[in-house]
């Protein structure tokens, strides 16, 4: 017997129609390069996205063609998030922070036909234009520059196109967007998102025990729209009818706080480096920003520290940890306390909240051991985290040599080493490649980093394993101090000794002005390992 429900395709046009039909007067705000604010509504985005679809079709867009973007967090990028897939194309957001050689490889590997680039980023495009042959280059006048010769003007194309648009018969499993991983381990890899995955992911992010995005929210996405499907925020905000505030090319802490105050932001999303800067500004300028309403900050991309969480709570902000990957669209876990946990001690509650949390609804997770057995949920047994679900990638685009990243029964092997406790909360111990093997025992670099960043003088800390003649590897910590503070190796060693066994504490502390990072804000440990490859340990 079959169910008697409508067979209604889960496609992006449904989200766009909802945004216009119910929330058409809700604002979308963009900070422009001159720091002025441009305002329009979901209704305006609806019309312009449909114009974009017509314009792309007139330029010759075919079903499944890839349209690349080289744009900041701006309204035109939001328009592309909808305009490209409703035309039957595949939106491909290029990570503008990658090396030009890598951008060229990605665009060629994806087979991008068209490029939409804003005039502010034309210098970035110039660095790889000779290596990628786009059929059309469409320039957005974000900074007000004249469209270069040989390119199409974005506003001119939209002005010539009609708002009247008939959606093609899109299938929910058709490709809607794609994004490449940041390439920390070898070449960047393409992840292709279906309409169905995006719609289900968006509905999930509106859930109470998830991002909890609603029509009452004003959302500030500080996570780049060109990274990891923009954390799904354009589609989630359309589903919920939330106001969206886009920071444009700016990520300075004071500018972020100005936007939060002026636009009454209730939800911000970003990586730890952004939030560290915002917290530092709040601490340095007490009382400058009058933000008296509840604000939720979601943090992903790297582990949060207790010091960061406690710091924001001093200022009345709440912080929630997330976990996901480009391969998971990207939301897969979030960390919220269960009702029975509210009676726990403060220390125990912080410990639980700093975990990556429980898998979100209809995403499954397991810990697998090297011998192929599944680990118990005891909060101790460490193995590789594997996940599966309706918005988890089943393979990489045109890279059959990467098939080993999936288990024989179809689970994604994340490369993260983790354990799961009795309540189902996942705690990442480290990336498998970043664990330190010392004297036959494993040491977590992440735990050491988070502990070090709890020291009042430490701004950032990255820990790596360095070859040792006796112990195989020993931990070395690279530390950036807060401005105007001092700390010495002996002091930091003593600070860590309160939480770690003596053999787990780094044998060396190197003080630096900055730590190299990836394009998405993670520590670039490959660069650190190369830097300290010839490190000589003291006898």
Regions found by a protein language model. Name each.
Residues 98, 104, 115-117, 389, ...:
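AMP-binding/adenylate-forming catalytic core of the ANL superfamily
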Residues 199-218, 226-266, 281-285:
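Conserved AMP-binding/adenylation subdomain of ANL enzymes
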Residues 358-386, 422-423, 485-489, 524:
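Conserved beta-loop-beta connector loops within the AMP-binding
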Residues 39-43, 176-203:
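Conserved AMP-binding A3 loop
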């Amino acid at each position: 017997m079959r169910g008697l429900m409508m067979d209604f395709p889960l496609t992006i046009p449904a989200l766009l129609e909802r945004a216009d039909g119910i929330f058409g007067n809700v604002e979308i705000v963009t900070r422009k390069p001159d720091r002025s604010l441009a305002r329009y509504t979901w209704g305006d985005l609806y019309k312009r996205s449909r114009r974009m679809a017509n314009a792309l079709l007139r330029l010759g867009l075919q079903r499944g063609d890839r349209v690349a973007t080289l744009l900041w967090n701006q309204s035109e990028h939001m328009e592309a998030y909808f305009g490209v897939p409703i035309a039957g194309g595949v939106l491909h957001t290029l990570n503008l922070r990658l090396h030009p050689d890598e951008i060229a490889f990605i665009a060629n590997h994806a087979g991008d036909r068209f490029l939409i680039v804003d005039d502010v980023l034309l210098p970035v495009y110039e660095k790889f234009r000779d290596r990628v042959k786009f059929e059309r280059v469409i320039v957005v006048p974000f900074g007000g520059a004249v469209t270069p010769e040989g390119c199409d003007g974005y506003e001119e194309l939209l002005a010539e196109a009609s708002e009247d648009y008939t959606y093609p018969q899109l299938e929910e499993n058709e490709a809607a967007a794609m994004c490449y991983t940041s390439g920390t381990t070898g070449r960047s890899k393409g992840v292709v998102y279906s309409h169905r995955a995006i719609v289900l992911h968006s509905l999930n992010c509106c859930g109470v025990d998830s991002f909890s995005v609603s029509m009452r929210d004003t959302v500030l996405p500080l996570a780049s729209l060109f990274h990891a499907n923009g954390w799904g925020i354009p589609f989630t905000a359309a589903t919920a009818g939330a106001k969206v505030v886009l920071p444009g090319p700016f990520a300075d802490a004071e500018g972020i706080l100005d936007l939060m105050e002026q636009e009454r932001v209730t939800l911000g999303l970003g990586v730890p480096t952004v939030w560290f800067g915002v917290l530092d500004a709040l601490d340095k300028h007490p009382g400058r920003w009058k933000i008296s309403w509840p604000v939720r900050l979601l943090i992903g991309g790297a582990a949060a520290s207790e010091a960061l969480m406690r710091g924001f709570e001093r200022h009345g902000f709440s912080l929630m940890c997330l976990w996901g990957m480009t391969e998971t669209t990207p939301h897969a876990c979030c960390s919220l306390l269960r009702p029975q946990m509210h009676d726990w001690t403060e220390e125990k509650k912080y410990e639980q909240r700093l975990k990556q949390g429980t898998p979100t609804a209809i995403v499954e997770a397991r810990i697998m051991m090297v011998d192929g057995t599944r680990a118990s949920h005891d909060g101790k047994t460490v193995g590789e985290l594997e996940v599966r679900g309706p918005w988890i990638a089943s393979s990489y685009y045109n890279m059959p040599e990467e098939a080993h990243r999936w288990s024989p029964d179809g689970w994604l092997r994340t490369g993260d080493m983790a354990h799961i406790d009795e309540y189902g909360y996942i705690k990442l111990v480290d990336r498998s490649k970043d664990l330190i093997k010392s004297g036959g025992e494993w040491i977590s670099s992440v735990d050491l980093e988070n502990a070090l960043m709890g020291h009042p003088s430490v701004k950032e800390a990255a820990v790596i394993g360095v070859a040792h003649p006796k112990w195989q590897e020993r931990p070395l910590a690279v530390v950036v101090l807060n401005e105007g503070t001092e700390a010495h190796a002996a002091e930091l060693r003593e600070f860590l000794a309160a939480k770690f066994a003596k053999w787990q504490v780094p044998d060396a502390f190197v003080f630096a002005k900055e730590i190299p990072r990836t394009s998405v804000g993670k520590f670039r440990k490959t660069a650190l390992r190369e830097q300290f490859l010839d490190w000589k340990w003291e006898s």
